[in-house]
Structures are given as structure tokens and as C-alpha cells.
């Protein structure tokens, strides 16, 4: 199959979210005068990940996620805060984090050289994702960036991809490839939209989900070999 349009997930696929989050949380919590920063992080990460999973499943809204995650975590430590205000303050710190995985820039450079049309398809907050890309070395490789908050829908809902198709001239699902690390968002989303997928699985996780990737890779070089 000759693919023309490559849709890349960002976090954990090209952008090193874990590294960026570590820096941003430390800066944010220091500014908030949190004493035991590590204890806060240990509770925050699973809570935050769980809320994003709930969003994928349609159990909560993006607004609920953004407005309540910090009020919930601070409440866990006996401190009452305005969740929305904390979210806005945290955005300032996380938005500066454009760390990428080693080789991500060279991957996109080579794919661009080969003539592929490259797009970003990400679940996230518009301000955060746009600013993280601005602080990264890979922004220039994307013809367009599709962010769930702007789209009014998110992966894995088929409507997310249908809206992308409407905005790309000549887009055909059978000539497009969704590339990402998340089985429940990226691969299931591609399945729902009827397009081929690449599961980026550098840690060799077992697929216990219902999502069925067309291809599975563990390195960027494998993607280049595939294409």
C-alpha cells in the first residue's frame, strides 16, 4: 500500500512527555510551595492518566478533566485550591516543554525528504500542545496540527479522523496511516476510522486491548524500513 498522509501522535511517540512533565511539575509545585514534591507526583501521575483514559472512553469531558484534576490532587493532601486557576498556572510550565525522543527530528526529516505529507493528531489542550511544539525542533515538519480541543472531539472517536479528512485536500483513508503509542487512542481510533495503523511500541508491551494494529514497530528505523 502506498501511503501519502502520515498522522503522528505526539506524546510518547515523538514528544517525550514524561521528561517534560517531570520538569514542569517540579517547577509548578515549587512555585506553589509544595513541600513534598515527590509525594505529590506519585499521586498525580496515576490520577491524571486515569482521567485521560476516562476522557477517551467518554466518561468525562475535557473541561472536567482540566478544571478538577488539580483540585482533586491538592485536596488529597488537605489543601483547597481553585482547580481552574491551578490548571492555567500549570499550563505556563508544561507549555515550555518541547523535549523530543532521540531521533524524532531525523525521522520526520527523512519522511519529509521522501515526499510524505506529515500531520500531528493529538489529544490535548490547544495552548499546551501548540506551545510545546513551538519549543521543540519538529514543529516545521507538520503541514497541520490537529488537536482534540480544537476539533471538538478526540481519539479514538471516528469523528476526529473524519474532521481531519475534511481539512486535508485529497485525503483518502486508504492512503493514510495513523502512527502512535496508544492502543486505546491511536490504534483503536484508526480502527474506528477504517485506516491502517502503526503501533509504536518501544517497550514491547503486550496488546491486551481490542485494538488491532496493522503494523507494530519498536523503533523509528523500523518505521522507515516499513515505509
What is each stretch, according to the model?
Residues 1-102:
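N-terminal helical cap/lid subdomain that shapes the substrate entry/recognition surface
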Residues 103-115:
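Catalytic-core regions built around general acid/base machinery
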Residues 122:
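Conserved phosphate-coupling serine/threonine residues in phosphotransfer and NTP-handling enzymes
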Residues 79, 116, 195:
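Short glycine/serine/threonine/alanine-rich loop segments
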Residues 1-6, 19, 30, 109-112, ...:
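Asp-based, Mg2+/Mn2+-dependent phosphohydrolase catalytic module
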Residues 119:
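Conserved serine/cysteine hydrolase catalytic core
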Amino acid at each position: 500500500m502506498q501511503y501519502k498522509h502520515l498522522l503522528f501522535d505526539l506524546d510518547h511517540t515523538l514528544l517525550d512527555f514524561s521528561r517534560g512533565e517531570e520538569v514542569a511539575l517540579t517547577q509548578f509545585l515549587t512555585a506553589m510551595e509544595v513541600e513534598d514534591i515527590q509525594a505529590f507526583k506519585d499521586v498525580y501521575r496515576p490520577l491524571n492518566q486515569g482521567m485521560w483514559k476516562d476522557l477517551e472512553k467518554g466518561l468525562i469531558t475535557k473541561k472536567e478533566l482540566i478544571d478538577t484534576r488539580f483540585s482533586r490532587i491538592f485536596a488529597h493532601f488537605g489543601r483547597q485550591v481553585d482547580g481552574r486557576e491551578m490548571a492555567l498556572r500549570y499550563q505556563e510550565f508544561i507549555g515550555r516543554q518541547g523535549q523530543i525522543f532521540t531521533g524524532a527530528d531525523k525521522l520526520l526529516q527523512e519522511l519529509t525528504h521522501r515526499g510524505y505529507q506529515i500531520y500531528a493528531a493529538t489529544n490535548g489542550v490547544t495552548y499546551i500542545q501548540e506551545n510545546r511544539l513551538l519549543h521543540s525542533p519538529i514543529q516545521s515538519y507538520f503541514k497541520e496540527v490537529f488537536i482534540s480541543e480544537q476539533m471538538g472531539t478526540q481519539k479514538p472517536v471516528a469523528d476526529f479522523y473524519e474532521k481531519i479528512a475534511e481539512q486535508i485536500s485529497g485525503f483518502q483513508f486508504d492512503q493514510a496511516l495513523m502512527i502512535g503509542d496508544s492502543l486505546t487512542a491511536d490504534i483503536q481510533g484508526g480502527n474506528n476510522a477504517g485506516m491502517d495503523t502503526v503501533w509504536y511500541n518501544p517497550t514491547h508491551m503486550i496488546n491486551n486491548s481490542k485494538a488491532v494494529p496493522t503494523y507494530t514497530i519498536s523503533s523509528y528505523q523500523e518505521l522507515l524500513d516499513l515505509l
